[in-house]
Amino acid sequence: MSTTALVEGKIVQCIGAVIDVEFPRDHMPKIYDALILEGSELTLEVQQQLGDGVVRTICLGASDGLRRGTTVKNTGKPISVPVGKPTLGRIMDVLGRPIDEAGPINSDVVRGIHQKAPAFDELSPSTELLETGIKVIDLICPFAKGGKVGLFGGAGVGKTVNMMELINNIAKEHGGYSVFAGVGERTREGNDFYHEMKDSNVLDKVALVYGQMNEPPGNRLRVALTGLTMAEHFRDEGLDVLFFVDNIYRFTLAGTEVSALLGRMPSAVGYQPTLAEEMGKLQERITSTKTGSITSVQAVYVPADDLTDPSPATTFGHLDATVVLSRDIASLGIYPAVDPLDSTSRQIDPNVIGEEHYSITRGVQQTLQRYKELRDIIAILGMDELAPEDKLAVARARKIQRFLSQPFHVAEVFTGSPGKYVPLKETIRGFKMIVEGECDHLPEQAFYMVGTIDEAFEKAKKIQ
């Protein structure tokens, strides 16, 4: 459609990020149509049709200085963003415009951010495991290639650091393309991530889309869809793509803000009434088809450490693996602070991961569960009152707990110890030795912040 043929309307009301625009009655824009402001780069997205030619839109950008009577043009199509190889190595905003000052993105292909999820008969479930090199994840909640993973945790327990380490280990080993969507997170983290990718020479395989904390709610709500659209394009070209989202909770929160601005009645805890539908629309599109796969890792902030909050609770149902980060474990100084009793994966099945891996995982969890049950008795009566087999279980559990810690590559600057990548075979061998009692003679400090079990033996020699 040429610019001359665009239907014009006028702004009739501005309330924060919500703008009402009046069009001729017979040329009323459709829901999700993108409207552009004359003489400015501001884009509005139609959310509601109020009747009499008036539509209610959400502003994708700062609405400062807007006034009634300003001319608005209807593009006649939804927001479209550039996709494909020209987006790699670039930082873009919600509209796919470059924000890295490295010139325009010369992509011939653009794609609307609102797409239908693949049909059921196109889906392709996978049982192939994706090795992360992080012991606790590979053992307790292994990831499936083409699966969906959630990193759940409250404020400051290490979601972003865990995600950075996963990107570091998977994106570098994986060799394929990755898309990172920064949804409502800190600008500093986005900057750190960009330089991390640049320094490790994988920037040319990553497309970065940011709608950070300082952006209006419209941007934060749509930026996840922008990133997903880019990932879908690579998948539909037959590639295996990694899709990272930090943070899904901010997507929900932006939806809450927009919903309130649009005048919808809030539901439980003040969330939007359409929470499940909005989450479903996003999550159903993050999926693997017979053409290609999307493996997604999503950080999910847990408000007030309450996993029953509607936002994280709605996300749980869509995931194949959940990695739950615990404040109690973080307070012990054990990082990554993954809770081995709360975290789970659909891949924990002897037919998928093999009998040995399955039995070791369950053995580790049983030992830790026994320790958890005995902690109250120990706190009141002390270790001496325990039966000999319980003392042994506690000693092994404390070694397992420490062996689940691991130095990260991305945290080297803070910890001073070099990061470790532990292959799955080594992880299983190490935990098997602890569970079967082959390490009972070693002190528990030897297991803290090491990679393989051999390093624990070396450390024990130094301690003794």
UniProtKB/Swiss-Prot annotation:
Keyword entries, A-Z: ATP synthesis, ATP-binding, Cell inner membrane, Cell membrane, CF(1), Hydrogen ion transport, Ion transport, Membrane, Nucleotide-binding, Translocase, Transport
Presence of keyword Translocase: yes
The protein's name in its UniProt record: ATP synthase subunit beta 2
Catalytic reaction(s) noted: ATP + H2O + 4 H(+)(in) = ADP + phosphate + 5 H(+)(out)
One CC-aspect GO term: plasma membrane
SMART domains in UniProt: AAA
UniProt-annotated binding residues for ATP: G153, G154, A155, G156, V157, G158, K159, T160
EC nos: 7.1.2.2
UniProt source species: Paraburkholderia xenovorans (strain LB400)
GO molecular function per UniProt: ATP binding; ATP hydrolysis activity; proton-transporting ATP synthase activity, rotational mechanism
UniProt membrane topology term: Peripheral membrane protein
Record function comment: Produces ATP from ADP in the presence of a proton gradient across the membrane. The catalytic sites are hosted primarily by the beta subunits.
Gene that this sequence comes from: atpD2
Self-association state and partner proteins as the record states: F-type ATPases have 2 components, CF(1) - the catalytic core - and CF(0) - the membrane proton channel. CF(1) has five subunits: alpha(3), beta(3), gamma(1), delta(1), epsilon(1). CF(0) has three main subunits: a(1), b(2) and c(9-12). The alpha and beta chains form an alternating ring which encloses part of the gamma chain. CF(1) is attached to CF(0) by a central stalk formed by the gamma and epsilon chains, while a peripheral stalk is formed by the delta and b chains.
UniProt superkingdom: Bacteria
Cellular compartment(s): Cell inner membrane
